[in-house]
Curated annotation (Swiss-Prot):
Sequence intervals crossing the membrane: 271-295, 305-326, 339-364, 379-400, 429-454, 475-495, 502-525
GO BP terms: adenylate cyclase-activating G protein-coupled receptor signaling pathway; B cell differentiation; cell surface receptor signaling pathway; G protein-coupled receptor signaling pathway; negative regulation of CREB transcription factor activity; negative regulation of non-canonical NF-kappaB signal transduction; regulation of cell migration
The name this protein goes by in its record: Adhesion G protein-coupled receptor G3
Regulation: Forms a heterodimer of 2 chains generated by proteolytic processing that remain associated through non-covalent interactions mediated by the GAIN-B domain. In the inactivated receptor, the Stachel sequence (also named stalk) is embedded in the GAIN-B domain, where it adopts a beta-strand conformation. On activation, the Stachel moves into the 7 transmembrane region and adopts a twisted hook-shaped configuration that forms contacts within the receptor, leading to coupling of a G-alpha protein, which activates signaling.
Region (GPS), start-end ranges: 215-262
Tissue-by-tissue expression: Expressed in cultured primary dermal lymphatic endothelial cells. Highly expressed in polymorphonuclear cells (PMNs) including neutrophilic, eosinophilic, and basophilic granulocytes.
Places the protein is found: Cell membrane
A GO cellular-component term linked to this record: specific granule membrane
Residues where cortisol binds: N510
Extracellular topological domain residue ranges: 21-270, 327-338, 401-428, 496-501
Disulfide links within the chain: C215-C244, C233-C246, C338-C420
Length: 549
């Protein structure tokens, strides 16, 4: 399954445990599902067993939210003790010790995954995995404390579902590098906006081609279980590893995610721009042709099917136009202008998805339901849905300030393309729900209807079929036309692996969707009734239009 972010990007180149719970008096305890704040050896071993199971397989018995919060809060529990502590388990290594705030030197700690973190002196050889805490961090702490508690934690989250979040549950090869989290905490305080950032060095081998490394932290405020965010962190790739510079303290990791190099982005952008330009020409021809037919043929004033086709073509025309303006403008203009371009592009993208769904709904009435298909003011109601529903979604998304500058970077973290979309650092739930989730619903509905319609077409009796000689060719043309109307090619972004060939096919086919629609419209409506390719579909259109009168 391809990355949900891949749909937007390709188109644009295109455990706070609850307290007060009573123990059940009967039945066995299920600590994997339960939540508590007990850190004695008995409860700790229970949680460790659950954590191990979830790390390995992501069992249904896992309460991911509770387990994640449990281990995040375990660090805070260690901070409450007064003595230096070391924790050494197969998946958790932790060091807690007192540090003087009146220091003249930065503090260094090793982060070797197989060892408990330890303080490293300035004159020692620096370990490949390490963290540097600037002295200014301790001097800026509130309360004029002379001594503070510092906790350094290394957590192996394994390949399961823990600490994955929506950004990594995409099946596109993304993941936490070496399944390792590094936690930093000082004095049980929420430390943010450091004047001098801390530095974490992750050593690793050279990443695979078309993969990039990004420094992130676990943001517990995102959603119900938290998610990864890169806000406040910068990424610098060095020969010895990747350096993360962040202006706050929390749990950090290095994400490995698919990316596109500059040459690929450039080629895809040119393909998309050329395809969109050609598509706009054909879509404009479709709209003009419909206007001509509406003036010259009386039946086009009452038929709903041509109106729906033209509405879809209009939404795609405006979507292509918004895309060309967006790519051409890049980061130019004010933040408000970028917000507007992102909102307009999002709106017409949702309009295109909606009209594809309405095309499928109309096909359902024509070929599947057939009888009792009368709806008063049918096209008006479809228009309210096709143009109004996306507007409501964009208003809701825009009110959360989700639009802004979006940057596509290559594996060296160089900017490949800038445009206005969902801004970086914002919650991605709006993107997942209003773009990928919404498209998935309309796409699956369209596929079900298309399958039913194709089955009907290919099982027509010989009495109503056209001549045997050209039957198969005409059926194939009908299938291709219907596929264009319901947006079959968009499924490449959801149901196929995000390989380079898929990227090119997606960019080409979707930018040329307008060409397919124009050819379908011309073949279906321009010739006389006797030479129409899909006579069965035309008769269905006429029958449905008659029922609306």
């Amino acid at each position: 399954m391809a990355t949900p972010r891949g749909l937007g990007a390709l188109l644009l180149l295109l455990l706070l445990p609850t307290s007060g719970q009573e123990k059940p008096t009967e039945g066995p305890r299920n600590t994997c599902l339960g939540s508590n704040n007990m850190y004695d050896i008995f409860n700790l071993n229970d949680k460790a067993l659950c954590f191990t199971k979830c790390r390995q397989s992501g069992s249904d018995s896992c309460n991911v939210e509770n387990l994640q919060r449990y281990w995040l809060n375990y660090e805070a529990h260690l901070m409450k003790e007064g003595l230096t502590q070391k924790v050494n388990t197969p998946f958790l290594k932790a060091l807690v010790q007192n540090l003087s705030t009146n220091t003249a030197e930065d503090f260094y700690f090793s982060l070797e995954p197989s060892q408990v973190p330890r303080q490293v002196m300035k004159d020692e050889d620096k370990p490949p995995d390490r963290v540097r805490l600037p002295k200014s961090l301790f001097r800026s702490l509130p309360g004029n404390r002379s001594v503070v508690r510092l906790a350094v934690t290394i957590l192996d989250i394994g390949p399961g579902t823990l600490f994955k979040g929506p950004r990594l549950g995409l099946g596109d090869g993304s993941g936490v590098l070496n399944n390792r989290l590094v936690g930093l905490s000082v004095g049980q305080m929420h430390v943010t906006k450091l004047a001098e950032p801390l530095e974490i060095v992750f050593s690793h081998q050279r990443p695979p081609p078309n993969m990039t490394l990004t420094c992130v932290f676990w943001d517990v405020t995102k959603g119900t279980t938290g998610d990864w965010s890169s806000e406040g962190c910068s990424t610098e790739v060095r020969p010895e590893g990747t350096v993360c510079c962040c202006d706050h303290l929390t749990f950090f990791a290095l994400l490995l995610r698919p990316t596109l190099d500059q040459s690929t982005v450039h080629i895809l952008t040119r393909i998309s721009q050329a395809g969109c330009g050609v598509s706009m020409i054909f879509l404009a021809f479709t709209i003009i042709l419909y206007a001509f037919l509406r003036l010259s043929r009386e039946r086009f004033k009452s038929e709903d099917a041509p109106k729906i086709h033209v509405a879809l073509g209009g939404s795609l025309f405006l979507l292509n136009l918004a895309f060309l303006v967006n790519v051409g403008s890049g980061s130019k203009g004010s933040d408000a202008a970028c917000w507007a371009r992102g909102a307009v592009f999002h709106y017409f993208l949702l309009c295109a998805f909606t009209w594809m769904g309405l095309e499928a709904f109309h096909l359902y009435l024509l070929a599947v339901r057939v009888f009792n298909t009368y709806f008063g003011h049918y096209f008006l109601k479809l228009s309210l849905v096709g143009w109004g529903l996306p507007a409501l979604m964009v208003i809701g998304t825009g009110s959360a300030n989700s639009y802004g500058l979006y940057t596509i970077r290559d594996r060296e973290n160089r900017t490949s393309l800038e445009l206005c979309w969902f801004r970086e650092g914002t919650t991605m739930y709006a993107l997942y729900i209003t773009v990928h989730g919404y498209f998935l619903i309309t796409f699956l509905f369209g596929m079900v209807v298309l399958a039913l319609v194709v089955w009907k077409i290919f099982t027509l009796s010989r009495a109503t079929a056209v001549k045997e000689r050209g039957k198969n060719r005409k059926k194939v043309l009908t299938l291709l036309g219907l596929s264009s109307l319901v947006g079959v090619t968009w499924g490449l972004a959801i149901f196929t692996p995000l390989g380079l060939s898929t990227v090119y096919i997606f960019a080409l086919f979707n930018s040329l969707q307008g060409v397919f629609i124009c050819c379908w419209f011309t073949i279906l409506y321009l010739p006389s009734q006797s030479t129409t390719v899909s006579s069965s579909t035309a008769r269905l259109d006429q029958a449905h239009s008659a029922s609306q009168e």
